Amino acid sequence: MAILGLGTDIVEIARIEAVISRSGERLARRVLSDNEWAIWETHQQPVRFLAKRFAVKEAAAKAFGTGIRNGLAFNQFEVFNDELGKPRLRLWGEALKLAERLGVAHMHVTLADERHYACATVIIES
């Protein structure tokens, strides 16, 4: 196995809150997959939930070396937790096609948040 990419991102939670205050659900609709949206709608801390998902997806886009463009969209990266609570990534659409083209076999995700910030790192391996 070889490391194909590494990405990290930090999000100021207050910025996400400000965007939601200004534009309602638009950011959440753009960022979240259908499964994540269902969780977001009933989450006790929806702003924090969205900030963490945004950080992971930005980190993933950086790890893939593409950013969010050329057919890639935030909602093609889905963050979920395995049976032990570890964050994982599931890919859809163009993100999945890109991973297959690059020969991605494993994606490692770490996610942390505290009062003001959410931070994520994604490593992709062949």
Swiss-Prot record:
Disulfide bond keyword on record: no
> Where does the record place it?
Cytoplasm
At the top level, the lineage of the source is Bacteria
Q: Which residues cross the membrane?
A: none
Q: Which UniProt keywords apply?
A: Cytoplasm, Fatty acid biosynthesis, Fatty acid metabolism, Lipid biosynthesis, Lipid metabolism, Magnesium, Metal-binding, Transferase
One Pfam family matching this protein: ACPS
* Catalytic class of the enzyme: transferase
Q: Residues that bind Mg(2+), according to the entry?
A: D9, E58
Recorded hits in SUPFAM superfamilies, A to Z, give:
4'-phosphopantetheinyl transferase
Q: Which cofactor does it need?
A: Mg(2+)
Q: What is its EC number?
A: 2.7.8.7
Where is this protein chiefly located? cytoplasm
What is a single cellular component term in the Gene Ontology annotation? cytoplasm
**Known catalysed reaction(s)?**
apo-[ACP] + CoA = holo-[ACP] + adenosine 3',5'-bisphosphate + H(+)
Q: Which GO terms describe its molecular function?
A: holo-[acyl-carrier-protein] synthase activity; magnesium ion binding
Gene3D superfamilies hit by this protein: 4'-phosphopantetheinyl transferase domain
Q: Which GO terms describe its biological process?
A: fatty acid biosynthetic process
Q: Which family does it belong to?
A: Belongs to the P-Pant transferase superfamily. AcpS family.
> In UniProt terms, what function does this protein have?
Transfers the 4'-phosphopantetheine moiety from coenzyme A to a Ser of acyl-carrier-protein.
In Swiss-Prot or TrEMBL terms, this protein is called: Holo-[acyl-carrier-protein] synthase
Q: Which organism is it from?
A: Citrobacter koseri (strain ATCC BAA-895 / CDC 4225-83 / SGSC4696)
